[in-house]
Structure formats: C-alpha cells, structure tokens
C-alpha cells in the first residue's frame, strides 16, 4: 500500500528520514501516526524509528538532545521542531511487567516491529508514503480487529498495561479484540495489579471517553480485567449498566462522574473511590461538585442554591452526565436558570466580613454562619443583593 499524499503533520519530519537514508540507514514513521493516517484520524505524535544507532544519528545531525539514549532515543532539532528518533531495538527481561530489563539495538525493522503491542500499531511508513506491513496490520484495520503481535501472553508479560490499551483502543476505534488476544487478556488479567494505578487510570479514562465505550467496557468485563482495577471488584453490574447507556461524555469530570453514578457510590464513598484512582485534587473536586447535581437535574428538583453551590462548569458537566445516562435535561433551560442567579460566587455578595467588622461585629463562627445564610437568601431571591439590606439582615441574624 502507498499513501500518495501524506498529511501535513509529516512534512516537517520528512527531511529527517531523507537525511538518514542518504547516510545509508533505514528510517520510517512508525506506530500510532501511521495507523491514524490510514484511518483518517487526527495525528498527534510523529514517531520515527531507524536502523542508525544513537551515535550515528548524532553524526548525521548537528543539533541533537539525548532524551532517552539508553533506549535509543535521540531528539533531532536541525529542522526547528524537535523530532525523536529511536533506534530499532529488541527488549528482554520484564521483571516488573512494564519495562524491559535490557535493550539491544538492532538493524532489522522486523525485529523492532515484532516487539510492539498490536498489529495495527506495528506498521511502518516510508518517506515516500509506502506502508511496510509485516504482521498484517492493514488486514486487521480493515477487519476492525485489535490483535497482539505474535503470542498475546508474551506481549502482556512484557507489559501488562497492554491489556488496558487493548480495551482502550476498542473504545477509541470501535474495533473488536481478536479472540486469541482476548483469551490472553483473560489468562493474564491479574498481572494488571503489577502496574502503577496512575498508568491504568490514563488508559481507563481514555476508554471512558472513547466513541465506542461499550466495546472497551465489554472487553474489561469479558476478561475480568476490571477486578484488578481500583474500587471495581464489586463493580461488574455498574460497568454493565454504564455500557448500556447513550454516553456522550466530553471530559474527565463527566467520565468519572458517570462511572461513579453507575457504580451507585454515595457521597461518603465518592472521594475515597476517586482518590483510589490517584486522580488530581482538582478533578476530584470537580466530580464531587457535579455528581450530586445530576440526580436533582434528572428529577427536576434542582433549585437555585444547588446551581450556585455547583458552579457554572459543574452545572454544565452535570447536564451532560444526566443526559448520557438517559436523562431528559434541557441544557438551555438549566443554563438560563444558572445565568439568572443574583450572584454566582461569594465575592459578588454586596456585604462581606470586612464590612461586618467595621460595623462592630466580632469575627468568629457566628459571623461566618450569618454570611452563609445571607448568601443563601440572596441566591434564592429572598433578599436583594444590596449593602444596606444585607447589613440590616445580618444584624437581625446576629441578635437571634
């Protein structure tokens, strides 16, 4: 197969391949950029593999940086944008089921490609657009199959995270996992516990945001991979329910929020679950704001205070989550209700703690409680957001 017109993203990198070839070595675009080009998907990273050893690359190009030279990776800066080239290599000894104990540089493209995870990622692309396919990756793209290169068990023992990647690609591309590869995932699912939670989390989040979430979740359920993920040992039914929903999730907050609701987590379980996945504090806060609002939006019981406490972004996320789980929430109506709030954050209240101190009120819990009550009354339209009105109301509250 030959791609007559390469996407524009490749153009700045093509001179690098030409220079390497002119020096007598092989060089190819490899991995996801080749797969996504063939599938007409957006291209993210341009990866280059070469038969030239790192020292030889540094002789060919004048401006280089050793970004991972022990693994054969050198960044070339000669053409402005930095591009990483990695020497063809074989790997051996995966004691942690993630990283090789040793790397050996080789001159053979086949030896390099056969260590890769899936056939659809083991494609190479020449500078002239010719696709090199040594493991029928093109056939598997046509068949919409995710298939391990060689023996699935070997690939998963080399890197147990590949099992999550298989499920993630199923969700992202809408592909099925080849039966032998799926069986290999079932047999080796427990190895996932050897992998850092943060790495599993990245793949799982991408899965939840895929266009075919159902495919990815089905793979996790069929292989029992989910049993080896944080907080999901009792989550089989919740994942099945999630897989049946008309999901249209757009960001991480929505993804984790929808998952939490389908798992039936209550307010006391939510934060520990999210922390177990090693999510950032900011994301945990965002999910914790959105989730309580979802049920209220779905049951039409969300009031002004609920919208105020959630904040604009959480309100928007909650609407998407609700509708992704089969709700009938009108986004425009909810947004209009939010915009109609008299104030949208505490700083907009016409009276603050400093004003009360000037008026002779002693700082303390009573003052804080009074300001909270005033805020609620303004949000709910019971009081005008006016300095004199609020000062008078505060005085009455503090006398009580």
Swiss-Prot record:
Pfam families in the cross-refs: PolyA_pol, PolyA_pol_RNAbd, tRNA_NucTran2_2
Classification via InterPro entries: Bact_CCA-adding_enz_type3_sf, CCA-adding_enz_C, CCA-adding_enz_firmicutes, NT_sf, PolA_pol_head_dom, PolyA_RNA-bd
Residue sites binding CTP per the record: 32, 35, 116, 159, 162, 165, 168
EC number(s) stated in the UniProt entry for this protein: 2.7.7.72
GO molecular function, one term: magnesium ion binding
Gene Ontology process terms (BP): RNA repair; tRNA 3'-terminal CCA addition
Residues annotated to bind ATP: 32, 35, 116, 159, 162, 165, 168
Annotated Mg(2+) binding sites: 45, 47
Required cofactor(s): Mg(2+)
Top-level taxon in the UniProt lineage: Bacteria
Catalytic activity of the protein: a tRNA precursor + 2 CTP + ATP = a tRNA with a 3' CCA end + 3 diphosphate; a tRNA with a 3' CCA end + 2 CTP + ATP = a tRNA with a 3' CCACCA end + 3 diphosphate
First-tier enzyme category under EC: transferase
Keyword entries, A-Z: ATP-binding, Magnesium, Metal-binding, Nucleotide-binding, Nucleotidyltransferase, RNA repair, RNA-binding, Transferase, tRNA processing
Function: Catalyzes the addition and repair of the essential 3'-terminal CCA sequence in tRNAs without using a nucleic acid template. Adds these three nucleotides in the order of C, C, and A to the tRNA nucleotide-73, using CTP and ATP as substrates and producing inorganic pyrophosphate. tRNA 3'-terminal CCA addition is required both for tRNA processing and repair. Also involved in tRNA surveillance by mediating tandem CCA addition to generate a CCACCA at the 3' terminus of unstable tRNAs. While stable tRNAs receive only 3'-terminal CCA, unstable tRNAs are marked with CCACCA and rapidly degraded.
Assembly and binders: Homodimer.
HAMAP family in UniProt: CCA_bact_type3
Note: A single active site specifically recognizes both ATP and CTP and is responsible for their addition.
Family to which the UniProt record says this protein belongs: Belongs to the tRNA nucleotidyltransferase/poly(A) polymerase family. Bacterial CCA-adding enzyme type 3 subfamily.
NCBIfam families for the chain: PRK13299.1
Name of the protein in its database record: CCA-adding enzyme
Organism of origin: Limosilactobacillus fermentum (strain NBRC 3956 / LMG 18251)
């Amino acid at each position: 197969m030959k791609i007559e017109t390469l996407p524009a993203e490749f153009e700045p990198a093509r001179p690098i391949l030409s220079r390497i070839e002119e020096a007598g070595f092989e060089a190819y675009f490899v991995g996801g950029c080749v797969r996504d080009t063939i599938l007409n998907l957006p291209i993210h990273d341009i990866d280059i593999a070469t038969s030239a050893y790192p020292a030889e690359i540094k002789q060919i190009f004048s401006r280089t940086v050793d970004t991972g030279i022990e693994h054969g990776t050198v960044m070339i800066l000669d053409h402005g944008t930095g591009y990483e080239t990695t020497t063809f290599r074989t790997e051996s000894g995966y004691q942690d089921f993630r990283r090789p104990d040793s790397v050996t540089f080789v001159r053979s493209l086949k030896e390099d490609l056969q260590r890769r995870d899936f056939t659809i990622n083991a494609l190479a692309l020449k500078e002239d657009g010719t696709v090199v396919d040594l493991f029928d990756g093109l056939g598997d793209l046509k068949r919409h199959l995710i298939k391990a290169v060689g023996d699935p068990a070997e690939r998963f023992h080399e890197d147990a995270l590949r099992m999550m990647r298989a499920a993630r690609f199923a969700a992202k591309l809408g592909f099925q996992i080849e039966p032998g590869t799926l069986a290999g995932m079932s047999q080796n699912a427990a190895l996932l516990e050897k992998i850092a939670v943060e790495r599993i989390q990245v793949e799982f989040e991408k899965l939840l945001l895929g266009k075919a979430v159902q495919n990815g979740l089905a793979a996790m359920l069929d292989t029992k991979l989910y049993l080896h993920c944080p907080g999901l040992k009792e989550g089989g039914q919740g994942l099945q329910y999630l897989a049946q929903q008309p999901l249209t999730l757009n960001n991480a907050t929505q993804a984790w929020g929808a998952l939490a609701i389908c798992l039936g987590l209550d307010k006391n379980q939510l934060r520990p679950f999210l922390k177990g996945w090693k999510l950032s504090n900011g994301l945990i806060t965002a999910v914790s704001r959105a989730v309580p609002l979802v049920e209220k939006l779905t049951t039409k019981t969300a009031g002004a205070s609920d919208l105020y406490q959630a904040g604009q972004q959480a309100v928007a996320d909650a609407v998407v989550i609700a509708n992704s789980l089969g709700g009938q929430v009108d986004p425009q109506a909810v947004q209009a209700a939010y915009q109609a709030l008299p104030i949208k954050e505490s700083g907009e209240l016409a009276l603050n703690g400093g004003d009360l101190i000037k008026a002779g009120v002693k700082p303390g819990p009573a003052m804080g409680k009074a300001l909270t009550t005033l805020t609620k009354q303004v949000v709910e339209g019971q009081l005008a957001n006016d300095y004199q009105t609020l000062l008078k109301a505060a005085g009455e509250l503090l006398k009580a």
